[in-house]
């Protein structure tokens, strides 16, 4: 079982979403946004750090997933986003959480099936995947989508690991049978 905290970073609004993964089953635990007032940037970063730390304390996740920085047209906006993202990552690392990063395009591809999906499509699919009665707000939906992407990544990794183990086991069994057959211990019946 994994509890995954997804973060959609922003210098003014940082979305968060928490899900529990048990096998292939995903369960919604909570979501929302850390909103900062029109303050200077250091104070906003302090609020983001405190907010993420509070969420970690409340939900006790064992994994932390965050959206990667994308190229922005405005350099100042990109720098502020990077600082907000770094602040959230520091909160996770200070709470001994492993950090996983996902590109926005991959998140949309995983959740909606289209890497260029818009926020409304992401909200709709998050609502369906987690069987929510109401659509989460956009920033929270994005954060939940990031958590869902990480859950799918875990499931995919387990599938690959199991396939590799099966292949290794099959190869060992084949080698064993060939050895025993060549020594006359088994006779093939056709």
From Swiss-Prot:
Cell cycle keyword on record: no
Catalytic reaction equation(s): Endonucleolytic cleavage at a junction such as a reciprocal single-stranded crossover between two homologous DNA duplexes (Holliday junction)
Gene3D superfamilies: Ribonuclease H-like superfamily/Ribonuclease H
Record's cofactor remark: Binds 2 Mg(2+) ion per subunit.
GO biological process, one term: DNA repair
Family annotation (InterPro entries): RNaseH-like_sf, RNaseH_sf, X-over_junc_endoDNase_Mg_BS, X-over_junc_endoDNase_RuvC
SUPFAM superfamilies in the record: Ribonuclease H-like
Positions of the catalytic residues: 8, 67, 139
Keyword field: Cytoplasm, DNA damage, DNA recombination, DNA repair, DNA-binding, Endonuclease, Hydrolase, Magnesium, Metal-binding, Nuclease
Positions of Mg(2+) 1 binding: 8, 139
Repeat keyword on record: no
Compartments reported by the entry: Cytoplasm
Residues that, per the record, bind Mg(2+) 2: 67
GO molecular function annotations of the record: crossover junction DNA endonuclease activity; DNA binding; magnesium ion binding
EC number, UniProt record: 3.1.21.10
Listed Pfam families: RuvC (PF02075)
GO cellular component: cytoplasm; Holliday junction resolvase complex
Cofactor: Mg(2+)
CDD domains xrefs: RuvC
Source superkingdom: Bacteria
PANTHER family: CROSSOVER JUNCTION ENDODEOXYRIBONUCLEASE RUVC
Family per record: Belongs to the RuvC family.
Assembly behavior: Homodimer which binds Holliday junction (HJ) DNA. The HJ becomes 2-fold symmetrical on binding to RuvC with unstacked arms; it has a different conformation from HJ DNA in complex with RuvA. In the full resolvosome a probable DNA-RuvA(4)-RuvB(12)-RuvC(2) complex forms which resolves the HJ.
The protein's role, per its UniProt record: The RuvA-RuvB-RuvC complex processes Holliday junction (HJ) DNA during genetic recombination and DNA repair. Endonuclease that resolves HJ intermediates. Cleaves cruciform DNA by making single-stranded nicks across the HJ at symmetrical positions within the homologous arms, yielding a 5'-phosphate and a 3'-hydroxyl group; requires a central core of homology in the junction. The consensus cleavage sequence is 5'-(A/T)TT(C/G)-3'. Cleavage occurs on the 3'-side of the TT dinucleotide at the point of strand exchange.
Protein name, per record: Crossover junction endodeoxyribonuclease RuvC
Designated gene of the protein: ruvC
